[in-house]
C-alpha cells in the first residue's frame, strides 16, 4: 500500500512534485517524504 496521496504502479509508489530543485535537493526532499523514497 502507498502512503495517502501517492499512486501505485507496478508495486512501487509515486508522487509528482512541481517544485524546481537541483537533483541533489530533490533526492533529499524525496527522502524526507517517505523513508526509502528516491527520485526517479
UniProtKB/Swiss-Prot annotation:
InterPro entries assigned to the protein according to its UniProt record, in alphabetical order: C-type_lectin-like/link_sf, CTDL_fold
Tissues expressing this chain: Expressed by the venom gland.
Protein name: Snaclec tokaracetin subunit alpha
S-S pairs: 2-13
Keywords: Disulfide bond, Hemostasis impairing toxin, Platelet aggregation inhibiting toxin, Secreted, Toxin
One Gene Ontology MF term: toxin activity
Compartment annotation: Secreted
GO cellular component terms given for this protein: extracellular region
SUPFAM superfamilies: C-type lectin-like (SSF56436)
Assembly behavior: Heterodimer of subunits alpha and beta; disulfide-linked.
Organism, as annotated: Protobothrops tokarensis (Tokara habu)
Domain of life: Eukaryota
Amino acid at each position: 500500500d502507498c502512503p495517502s496521496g501517492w499512486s501505485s504502479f507496478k508495486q512501487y509508489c509515486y508522487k509528482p512534485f512541481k517544485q524546481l530543485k537541483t537533483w541533489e535537493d530533490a533526492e533529499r526532499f524525496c527522502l524526507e517524504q517517505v523513508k526509502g523514497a528516491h527520485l526517479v
